[in-house]
Each structure stands twice: as C-alpha cells, then as structure tokens.
A protein has these predicted regions:
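Soluble extracytoplasmic regions of secretory-pathway and membrane proteins
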Residues: 4-489, 495-499, 504-535, 539-543, ...
Length: 560
C-alpha cells in the first residue's frame, strides 16, 4: 500500500534498516556532523568490552567501540590535563573511561574541518551528506575569490547570499561577508562522517587561483580525474554561487546601454511570501530551490537550481519578469563533469505579461474562500497547518505555482504529513490531495501532465492521455528559450490566450461520502461552538468541541 503523505526512505529506523544496510561496507555511525557536540572521547584497548553508546535497544542500549583514527590520543596524564584545561572539563582528567587507547574528537563540524585544512577558501553556507561507497560523506563547496579582478562588479558576498533559509536555519548560513568581484567554485571537499578525514578535489582545473594554491601546497588536492562515479553522482551546483549570480543578473540581464543607465528594466529577487509578515517587511528573500524540470533550451527534465524575478522597486503590483535556472546534475562518470552542468538558463517574460509573481500567487491562495475554509478545518483542534515552499514551475509553455500543505500534530514528537497541494496558473487556483488532482482542477479536466504523486492511496495508478497543449491554455505567459553562446539561455515568449471565461472552470476534487460527512460534522460543530460561546453555555461548548475533535480525527483517518 502506498502511503502518500509520508516520505519513503531508502534507509530508516534504529538500528537502521533498508537498501544501504544490505551492503556489507555501509557504515551508519556518525561522529562528525554540523550538530555534533564540542568534543567526544572514544576508543578502548583491544579486547575490552565496548561501552560507547550506539543506539537504544532494550533496557541497556547497544554499545560500540570507535575503530577509526579521528583525533589525537590522550592516554597520558599530560595530554589529559591540557585538554581538560582547553574544554574546561575535569571529567577528561578524572574519568576512569579515559584509557591508553582513548582519542578525543573535536572540530567536528565538517565546514570547520575544511576551513582548518584550507583556510584560504571561502566555503558555501550549506553542507550536505551523501552515502559514497558505503560511507557517509559531508560535501562542502569551496570558492576561490578576489577583489582585484579588472573591470568587474564588486559584490558583498554575504549580502548576496542571504535569504529566508539562512535567516531561519541553524545549519545553513550565508557566505562570509566580504567584497569580491571574482568567485569560482574551484573545490569540492568531502568529510568522512565516521573518522573526520578531509579530501579536497580540484573542481575547476582552469582556475588560475587554485593552480597557485596547488603550487604552494603540493599534494593537498586530488585531481578531478580521481572523483569516483559514486561521488560525482551526488555533487551539485552550489546555492551560494547561484545566489550571487542571480543578484548580478538583476541588472546585467539588460543589454541596452541606455536602459542600463536609466535602470528602468532592473529586476529583483522576490521576498519569500511564506515567511512571517515581520520577515517580509525586512525584505527577507526567497531562496532558490532544487527541482527536476524541463526549461527552455533543455530537451528533457534536468536536475536544476531555480529562482524567479520581479520588477525592481517598491510597487505593490508584483508580476513575474524572469525565471532563472542552472543545470545542477554533475553526472555519474568517474572524473568527468556532465556536459551541461553549470549552464544558466534565463527565461525572460514579455514586458506586457501579467503573470503573477510569488507574492501575488501566495495572496491568491490565501484569498480563496474554499482553501481558507478547508485549512481552518484542518487546523482546528490539536493539529497545525504548515505551508511548504512556494515553487515556480514551467509547464505546458507557461509557469505554474505549486505549494504543498502539511498537517502536524501539536505533540513534541510528531512530524509534518503532506495533506494537500495548492496549484495556481494565472488567476486559477487548484487545491486537492495530490499535485496531479490539483493540476486537473486548474486546467478544467485533464491537465496533460503526469505528476509524480499520480499514484492513488491504494497503490493503483490512474492512466492519463498526454494532451500537452491543454496545459498552455490557462493564464500564464509562454517562455520558450534558445541557448545562448555564453552558456546562458536567454528566452522570451508571448502572452498566451488568457480568456478567463473559457477553458478553465477550476474543477472539483473527488471526495468520498464518508469524508464529506466528517467535514460537514466538523463544520456544524464549529457553528455549535460559536453559538454556545456567545450564550455562555460552557457545557454545550465543551460538548461541541469534543464533537469537532472527533470529526477532524475521522476526516484525517479517511484521508490517509
């Protein structure tokens, strides 16, 4: 049976089970990570019973002994005294668990370890894990930078790489704040999550700056040819570099000198409309998103990093002016980067286009009476509704907005479950259990697109006829592009026929009679609660609230 509202893991559980565990070489233990404690003392003499906690099981818990070489040994009293002073812990000095084979692991953040090895690199704000040849590896992107490149625009790297993710995340940050007019992703680094070993790979072999550093520190780097196919398949275009590029393109997409100096056609990255009102007032930008999609100039869906543009200025009329993507798939061949990796594709919408920007699309979602009613029902009682990322997607010659909606119990151990999907195309809004159904609502029937969640809850798959032209008749702008000679696709299109009286009725979601009954009961219980509260009849109010909770629980069960 397919459980559509929960993620499907390759490996999960404690102890872990899944496809990775089936491999004898898989090492699931993580001693180095962005969230690791300041230090840890590990290791024991050979033959000693293990006492390091591994994972909970039974009343005692499973134990393990670290077998790597991840830190200095502290078996003698002098070393223990030094580290006790450094970390301000008398346990290092007096604990009987510190023995002749003990190692102390510190500097456990992957980014920190790479910075210790290569302090001359500027490091990307996001570190991500991948399983490479059976080992968990943290991947860190490294940049060479300069502020002395002739005839180039100076940019504050810290400001250019800020967005709502860096503002709210404890593990993702912007680039170091410094001015630069030269930046290249010249290095890919990996940190082994088990023993902390660092490997540096030259990614951009043509970069003169990294060539100079290689001469200063011979033997520090592995060559591109040494990157295994397994590691290559996990490498991707880095976010911070893309954010710097999208910031520069807000001005430098203009090719006319007069328009450039007047600034009349400048763009800006939209504020993240899913953030709080306070964050939006501080102009916290929408982050780029990794998506697999087909854009102008690509012949098939490509793993890409994407962002959008709106006109510069403070106008409240927010329309979409451009859509930027970069091919982020590095391929899976040893020592060979994918042919289109790093290709920027800019799709520019016509100046007379009225395609809503992300903020306007979010307002359309919020203003829908049907959407608000059902979200209020889902949020009543002990559940909270969480809006997901607002995604901009090219579809059928136009652009659509997609936003997942999650429901999360108020319990401390609960996690969000996908319950609904919002879709907007022009002024039309779809709201259904799956992306496939929401697209059908927006396009008044068969959207012609087969979404990845088209599989029904019972595991069966609905068949669809490919009618790609259908998806292009709603309210969006065409954005068909052609490749530029410099690796950037600049594309523009014309307005599609946007007659709101034809071809788009909004559709209706299919709903079982039991689910309708449960939602009607919940609606009636809410009315009864309001009436009882106005009368001051708290006994009736409590009874109505009980019925409301029962109806909502039943509705949630029926939707799973």
């Amino acid at each position: 049976m397919c459980i559509r509202d929960r993620p499907k893991f390759f490996e999960a559980g404690i102890p872990t089970q899944g496809k990775l565990t089936e491999s004898e070489q898989y090492e699931p233990r993580i001693y180095f990570s962005p969230n690791a404690s300041e230090y840890s003392i590990v290791g024991a003499p050979e033959g000693t019973q293990s006492w390091e906690f591994d994972y909970p099981t039974g009343s005692e818990g499973a134990t393990n002994t670290f077998g790597g070489n991840g830190g200095p040994k502290i078996g003698n009293i002098f070393s223990r005294l030094l580290y006790a002073i450094r970390f301000g812990s008398d346990q290092i000095l007096f604990s009987n668990r510190v023995n002749s084979a003990s190692q102390i692991l510190y500097d456990r953040s992957p980014k920190e370890r790479v910075a210790k090895v290569a302090p001359y690199l500027t490091l990307d704000g996001r570190v991500y894990p991948a399983v490479v040849d059976g080992r968990v590896k943290w991947i860190v992107d490294g940049y060479t930078t300069s502020d002395a490149y002739p005839y180039s625009q100076m940019t504050d790297l810290g400001e250019a790489s800020k967005d709502s993710t860096t503002e709210s995340s404890a593990t993702v940050s912007e680039l170091a704040s410094k001015n630069a007019n030269y930046i290249r992703n010249s290095v890919k680094a990996t940190v082994d999550a088990y023993d902390g070993s660092v490997d540096l790979y030259v990614w951009d072999e043509s970069d003169p700056v990294i060539k100079a550093w290689q001469k200063i520190f011979p033997g520090q780097y592995h060559q591109l040819s040494e990157i295994s196919g397994d590691l290559m398949s996990h490498l991707r275009y880095p976010e911070s570099l893309f954010k710097v590029q999208r910031e520069l393109l807000t001005k430098y997409h203009v090719s006319s000198a007069s328009q450039f100096f007047s600034g009349e056609d400048f763009w800006q990255t939209p504020v993240d409309p899913t953030e709080s009102q306070q964050a939006q007032e501080r102009d916290i930008l929408q982050p780029p998103y990794y998506l697999t999609l087909q854009t102008g100039g690509s012949n098939e869906p490509v793993f890409s990093l994407t962002s959008s543009y709106i006109p510069a200025g403070t106008s409240t009329r927010e329309i979409l002016t451009g859509f930027l993507s970069v091919d982020s798939d590095a391929g899976n061949e040893k020592g060979k980067i994918g042919a289109n990796y790093g290709t920027l594709r800019l799709q520019e919408l016509p100046k007379d286009s009225n395609v809503p920007g992300p903020g306007q699309a979010q307002n359309n979602f919020n203003a829908s009476a049907d959407v608000s009613k059902e979200l209020n029902l889902l949020e009543s009682g002990s559940t909270n509704v969480q809006r997901g990322n607002l995604l901009t997607l090219p579809l059928g010659g136009g652009l659509v907005y997609v936003q997942p909606v999650y429901v999360k119990s108020s319990g401390s151990t609960s996690f969000p479950l996908l319950k609904k999907v919002l879709v907007a195309f022009g002024d039309q809004v779809g709201f259904a259990n799956t992306l496939d159904e929401a697209l059908d609502q927006v396009f008044g029937g068969n959207s012609g697109a087969s979404a990845g969640d088209a599989e029904n809850v019972d595991g069966s798959t609905s068949s669809k006829t490919d009618t790609s032209d259908t998806a292009g008749t709603g309210g969006g702008a065409s954005a068909n592009g052609s490749s530029g000679t410099d690796g950037t696709d600049s594309s523009s299109g014309s307005n599609s026929n946007n007659d709101s009286s034809s071809g788009n009725t909004g559709g209706s979601s299919t709903m079982s009679s039991d689910l309708k009954s449960a939602l009607n009961d919940a609606s009636q219980a809410m009315k009864d609660s309001d009436a009882a509260m106005k009368k001051g009849d708290w006994s009736a109010y409590g009874e109505a609230q009980k019925k409301l909770q029962e109806a909502l629980n039943k509705a949630l069960e029926l939707e799973q």
